[in-house]
């Protein structure tokens, strides 16, 4: 890393830390904010790329780079946590989308860990707005996999089986994360709006609420709740994913209690 780049980074960190020190926070809140700093959540993009609608989320600029106001980030991520928890507790499904190089491995790991639908490869147009067609493709994918595992495809020629295997591999790439999504989601969570605008547009068109991690170059009005963060850095997204994970698990726990209570009443 160049000396100039180091100086910019040092200045950015100093600006973020100074803001924390000057803000009336409890020791616990300051400690939590420091975790956001350590995870590089506060880095925006260059000032020249800033979307004017993001100005309210920007603390200052250092070396031509925007520094995100972490107070805004933490407020938004807490609000997001409540929305996610309440949506799942009420029986709604969520889908997580993140197809950028920084986001896809984190989205895949999170979805598998907490058992929610996710898209970590290309978001297929119509995943929400043409859900019936997508559902038909998912059913076909699941049947093809089942037939392959049961040996039902053994009756075909070697060439035909090779083609089936290629098709299974292709469909796995696009549908493995959403094969259990049997109804429209009640909430869309986007890891990096800049690289995932299609799910935001489809959610808006279908009147489905959306939450997104948004950098300073994106349009926060494209989603219902924008969380200003550094969405191009895997360390930042991995840290932020822990908040989403906690909210999902809390919602699932509340939902389980409701289901049990309902059965007892019957």
Language-model features, listed with the residues they occupy:
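Non-catalytic, charged low-complexity extensions flanking SF2 helicase motor domains
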Residues: 262-266
């Amino acid at each position: 890393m160049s000396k100039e780049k180091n100086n910019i980074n040092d200045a950015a960190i100093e600006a973020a830390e100074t803001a924390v020190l000057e803000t009336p926070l409890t020791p616990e809140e300051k400690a939590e904010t420091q975790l956001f700093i350590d995870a590089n959540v506060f880095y925006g993009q260059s000032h020249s790329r800033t979307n004017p609608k993001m100005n309210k989320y920007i603390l200052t600029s250092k070396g031509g780079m925007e520094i995100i106001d972490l107070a805004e980030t933490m407020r938004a991520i807490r609000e997001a946590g409540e929305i996610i928890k309440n949506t799942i507790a009420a029986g709604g499904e969520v889908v997580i989308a993140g197809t950028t190089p920084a986001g896809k491995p984190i989205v895949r790991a999170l979805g598998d860990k907490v058992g929610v639908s996710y898209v970590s490869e290309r978001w297929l147009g119509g995943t929400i707005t043409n859900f019936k067609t997508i559902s038909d493709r998912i059913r076909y994918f699941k049947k093809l996999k089942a037939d392959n595992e049961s040996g039902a495809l053994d009756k075909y020629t070697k060439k035909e089986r090779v083609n089936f295997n290629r098709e299974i591999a292709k469909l796995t790439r696009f549908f493995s994360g959403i094969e259990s999504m049997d109804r429209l989601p009640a909430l869309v969570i986007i890891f990096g709006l800049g690289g995932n605008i299609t799910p935001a547009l489809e959610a808006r068109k279908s009147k489905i609420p959306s939450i997104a991690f948004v950098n300073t170059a994106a349009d926060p009005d494209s989603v219902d709740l924008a969380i200003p963060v550094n969405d191009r850095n895997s360390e930042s997204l991995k840290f932020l994913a822990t908040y989403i994970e906690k909210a999902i698990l809390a919602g699932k726990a509340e939902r389980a209690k409701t289901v049990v209570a309902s059965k007892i009443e019957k």
